[in-house]
Amino acid sequence: MGYTDQRFDVNLSILFTELPLLERPAAAAAAGFTAVELWWPWIDTATPEQSELDALKKALEDAGTQLVGLNFYAGQLPGPDRGAVSVPGEESERFRANIDIAADFAASVGCKALNALYGNRVEGVDPAIQDTLALENLVLAARAADRVGAILLIETLNKPESPLYPLVSAPSAIEVVDKVNEATGLGNAKFLLDIYHLSMNGEDVSQVIAEYAAKTGHVQIADNPGRGAPGTGELPLEQLLDELKKAGYDGWVGLEYKAADAAASFEWLPAEARPAS
């Protein structure tokens, strides 16, 4: 098995960021990749102009790259925010305004996975109120995703780097996944299994894979420590991806790591393994 048996995509919100957004798909293609993913690209607005959406679609198509994962609006990310789903007031309103825009854009480019970051705890707000709001918003997002034939992803982050984010263990994210599926009856809410975040939380990644592979809709990787490319840290990433394969996961593996020189950071992956089949 090994890396050559996986389907990798490049996260263009963390790699190739030295380039303007519309140049990044071509850079990923030049490095040999045919699949990419993105955080919400317009951090200052949940409702970009149609011309901006069209320009990104054209950049993806011109590069011959398939968008396989897209975040809903998530506030200032990169930045201090970790989503808007559970944040009362204007941020929740922005998220709701973004739902159909993100879903329709995903449909226009054939993207089948939409990620909704839960949002930080807000000082002075009862966590139960935030959780109720989150479920309401995630139900709306799941229905929109289903309308365009996509899944809704729920992600665990890590407590050291995101201390106000409440979903900092696999079970906490799975609980939300199950609640959304119970509320909608659609079954399209899935776990985003990020090996870097799980390891930063001190979780047994192999155990998480064994328990939750069947509920996993997308995987992301970076090595630890450092959040760099595979081989720069201490995680047995190739082994863990093999475990995912053996557990039945055959979806995408997003490369969501930091690198000063993105093109040079792919040396660990043979060129023939980069195009998605």
Regions found by a protein language model. Give the residues of each.
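Aromatic/hydrophobic pocket-lining residues that form π-stacking "cages" and hydrophobic walls in ligand
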Residues: 24, 55-56, 102, 141, ...
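N-terminal small/glycine-rich loop or linker at the start of catalytic domains
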Residues: 1-12, 71-86, 118-122
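Glycine-rich, aromatic-flanked loop segments that form ligand/cofactor-binding clefts
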Residues: 60-74
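Conserved beta-strand positions in the central sheet of alpha/beta enzyme cores
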Residues: 37, 69-71, 115, 153, ...
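Glycine-rich, proline-tolerant flexible connector loops at the mouths of alpha/beta enzymes
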Residues: 37-61, 118-122, 126, 161, ...
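Active-site-proximal loop/turn and secondary-structure-junction residues that shape catalytic pockets
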Residues: 14-16, 40-42, 73-76, 118-122, ...
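Active-site acidic/histidine proton-transfer and metal-coordination neighborhood
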Residues: 62, 81-190
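Histidine-acidic metal/acid-base catalytic patches
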Residues: 1-14, 18-32, 110-111, 151, ...
